[in-house]
């Protein structure tokens, strides 16, 4: 056996060792981290009600600090609005079931409404028995809107862009017309069009 034949396995072993060391040494940073320094500013008024801003929980603040993106919450009268803004929807966008159940709510999926934006509807029952309508839509800076997280992620993988989760909370017993009026008021305040739901970045 010639020297070259003897060295070949050794060279291969060295190459694999170098590759392994390189992989181990790479920074442990997730690839789906959103663009940093994203901010969300909710409208000061919606439908005649002034915003009462609600602070994010400490774990929510830590999450957005680590993985980018941003969120803001406010109460308008007897209704609430949560907006999440991200360039990495795979990381940040999800149905409200996960968070609400973690807070002790019983959550039931009730279907999809297209009266305004494509919207997934949930019924959330608080530990004290109070019931709420939780409506969630996802819209992008590219003009897409959907009620489905998977569709939002698929569109993001095709075209990128900034994605927003719009979560509206209202008492469960309101009429559909009242809920639709609330949605339309939010859309007007945030420059969202139902035919081309583009959220103007200047508003955030």
What residue spans do the PLM features occupy?
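Short, small-residue-biased leader/transition segments that mark boundaries at the very start
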Residues: 1-3
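Extracellular/secretory pathway and lumenal proteins
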Residues: 5-6, 103
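Internal/C-terminal transmembrane anchor helices
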Residues: 6-29
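A short, solvent-exposed beta-edge/loop patch
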Residues: 19-21, 111-204
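Hydrophobic alpha-helical transmembrane segments in integral membrane proteins
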Residues: 21-43
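Low-complexity, compositionally biased segments
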Residues: 35, 40, 95-101, 176-179, ...
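Generic detector of short, well-ordered, non-transmembrane alpha-helical segments enriched
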Residues: 42-45, 163
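Short, solvent-exposed recognition patches
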Residues: 44-158
């Amino acid at each position: 056996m010639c020297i070259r034949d003897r060295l070949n396995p050794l060279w291969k072993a060295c190459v694999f060792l170098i590759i392994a060391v390189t992989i181990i040494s790479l920074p442990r940073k997730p690839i789906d981290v959103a663009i940093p320094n994203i901010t969300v500013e909710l409208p000061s008024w919606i439908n005649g009600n002034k915003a009462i801003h609600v602070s994010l929980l400490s774990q929510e603040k830590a999450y957005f600090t680590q993985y980018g993106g941003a969120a803001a919450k406010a109460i308008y009268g007897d209704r609430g609005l949560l907006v999440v803004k991200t360039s990495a929807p795979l990381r940040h966008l999800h149905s409200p079931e996960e968070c609400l159940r973690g807070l002790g709510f019983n959550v039931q999926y009730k279907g999809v409404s297209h009266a305004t934006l494509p919207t997934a509807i949930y019924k959330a029952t608080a530990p004290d028995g109070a019931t709420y309508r939780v409506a969630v839509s996802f819209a992008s800076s590219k003009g897409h809107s959907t009620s489905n997280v998977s569709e939002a992620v698929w569109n993001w993988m095709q075209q990128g862009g900034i994605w927003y989760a719009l979560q509206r909370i209202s008492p469960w017993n309101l009429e559909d017309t009242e809920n639709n009026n609330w949605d339309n008021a939010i859309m007007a305040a945030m420059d969202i069009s139902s035919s081309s739901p583009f959220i103007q970045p200047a508003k955030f």
